Amino acid sequence: MSTPVTRTQVPDGVRDRLPSEAAAMRRLSARLDNVFRAWGYREVSTPVIEYLEAVAAGAANWGRREDLYQFFDRKGRTLALRPDMTTPIARLMATRLADEPLPLRLSYFAPVFRHRELRAGATSEIWQAGVELVGAPGEAADAEVISLACAAVRAADLTGFRIGLGHVGVVEGLFESAGVDPQAAAVLKEAMVARDLVAFEQGVARAGLSGERAERLLALVHFHGSYAEAVARFGGVGGRVAEALQHLGRVLEVLEALGVAEQVNLDLGLVRSLGYYTGVVFEGYLPGIGAPVLGGGRYDNLVAEFGRPLAATGFALEVDRLLMAQEQQGALAAEPGLDAVIACPPGQEAAAMAWAARLRAQGLAVEVDFLDRTGEELAAYARARAAARVLRPGVPSIH
């Protein structure tokens, strides 16, 4: 049975933004855009609404179609609100950007939509800022996007940022070496995404794993350490695991040269909920925020879903979590006030508005009071609007 609603409510998982909140978001957007452009990333936008077949290219790997917002158009075709930006940009890369020289560096600032459990400040309308580096394989490209993620968080005047770094090949390789079947692997990955250690241990037991095979998998989900420790613990498995560890080592070498390695910790049990990742994966964290503020990684097979095989890597920042961190750390810039409020006595509307126009032409932010407030009432309104002064017709002031 549906829950009654009123016309003054908004749906679960979405919110209004008041002027100060919208201004804070716009300032953050400008800072991030400046950083992205300085690194050569150009902004693109894609439709909020896509055909289900298009977003399913990402969601199929994800296995979470029930989290999509789906509906029909007038021709009976199934549409969906985009659940992420990476999949639409992959479509764009394979179509309208097919003739662009590679690698392509693209950025975005946009909302995505997913049904999510509404806890810990989570919403279903998720504003993201991110980048995609397409057509560049290898550790240098992986290191660039990780380093850019660090630069973006610095641009937001936030401190204490850390990145957890993993690799799909380590997880998949350990599952293969332990003989985990695909169904059991899916259960284990779901537990890893949720960071549910109890569910993971139960999944290992149900899969019939014991001895060294079980110990390695349990060590995987608990591992947070240095590269040397990772090689010592898992390097002997060989195969995909050894290859993935070698790649991580080369990425860390580049990050060391870029001066950001101290912000990066190996988190080999890291699994991202979006299942199109094929190599390096990472998440970013800030003190006092109980969920990742950033996630990303390499997805070398996704663009091929749209007919154009291309290596790619990128990340997405969760804007509202960054804003929450800015508020906690006192990094939110004060909202700019007005330069003046102009009093507007009856019959002087045209003169007051013309005066305001002249001041705006000088670059000032000016508001005309149409409610005929006077004295302390007008002064109180000006204070509420953070106006530097009150101007009255016939009283000399700024011109």
Curated annotation (Swiss-Prot):
The keyword Cell cycle does not apply. GO terms for cellular component: cytoplasm. It is found in: Cytoplasm. The keyword Protein transport does not apply. Its main location: cytoplasm. This function is generally fulfilled by the C-terminal part of HisG, which is missing in some bacteria such as this one. Heteromultimer composed of HisG and HisZ subunits. This is ATP phosphoribosyltransferase regulatory subunit. It comes from Symbiobacterium thermophilum (strain DSM 24528 / JCM 14929 / IAM 14863 / T).
